[in-house]
């Protein structure tokens, strides 16, 4: 298979966390273009299905405007049972999410979709990670909400920040919880691109 330059790759996301994770494994996409799509879940849509649909929709939206590029779409979803916890739009929503997750296990689904030029091939991988938070005190909830670290985070969770001390255990991929499963992403991209880890 012909190996290509990373200049031919578009990341369909403006997430600083995902950009940093890609740089961690020496991947710098040629372009970074966020996709403007409708992110509302469908009625009775399961978290995994939603994550896959969002990653695919982001990649397809960007590739429709850039058909000659490879496009990487990614989506991370926090779920408590079958309930999808979206990004909190205000502190009240963030508080509901944090109280729901307090003392409970939840799942983080991150889907990665790689489209080859003209959508000739489509590769999708989904990683599921189980996380359990300690039971939070009222003071901990208050401090976390005041920090505003919940902003622009799936389920209002930022385990790279203050919420990291809430984690009793994590089973799965830490990088996936942050926003990009590095192992799966590396395996997908290494089939097409020439880059070195070292």
UniProtKB/Swiss-Prot annotation:
Pfam families on file: Maf (PF02545)
Residue stretches in coiled coil: none
What this protein is called in its record is dTTP/UTP pyrophosphatase
Which superkingdom?
Bacteria
- What function does this protein fulfil? Nucleoside triphosphate pyrophosphatase that hydrolyzes dTTP and UTP. May have a dual role in cell division arrest and in preventing the incorporation of modified nucleotides into cellular nucleic acids.
Read off the InterPro entries from this record: ITPase-like_fam, Maf-like
Cellular location of this protein? Cytoplasm
Query: Which keywords belong to this entry?
Result: Cytoplasm, Hydrolase, Nucleotide metabolism
Q: Which family does it belong to?
A: Belongs to the Maf family. YhdE subfamily.
């Amino acid at each position: 298979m012909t190996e290509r330059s990373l200049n031919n790759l578009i990341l369909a996301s403006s997430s600083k966390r995902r950009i940093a994770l890609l740089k961690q494994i020496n991947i710098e996409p040629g372009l970074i273009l966020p996709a403007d799509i409708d992110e509302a879940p469908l009625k009775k849509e399961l978290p995994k299905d939603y994550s896959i649909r969002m990653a695919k929709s982001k990649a397809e939206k960007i590739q429709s405007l850039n058909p000659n590029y490879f496009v990487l779409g990614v989506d991370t979803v926090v779920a408590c049972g079958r309930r999808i916890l979206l990004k909190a739009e205000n502190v009240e929503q963030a508080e509901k999410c944090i109280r729901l997750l307090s003392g409970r296990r939840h799942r983080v689904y991150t889907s990665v979709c790689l489209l080859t030029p003209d959508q000739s091939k489509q590769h999708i991988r989904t990683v599921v990670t189980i996380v359990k938070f300690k039971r939070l005190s009222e003071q901990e909830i208050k401090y976390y909400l005041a920090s505003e670290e919940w902003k622009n985070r799936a389920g209002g969770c930022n385990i790279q920040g203050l919420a990291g001390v809430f984690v009793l255990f994590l089973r799965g991929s830490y990088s996936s919880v942050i926003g990009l499963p590095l192992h799966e992403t590396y395996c997908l991209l290494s089939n097409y691109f020439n880059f070195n880890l070292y």
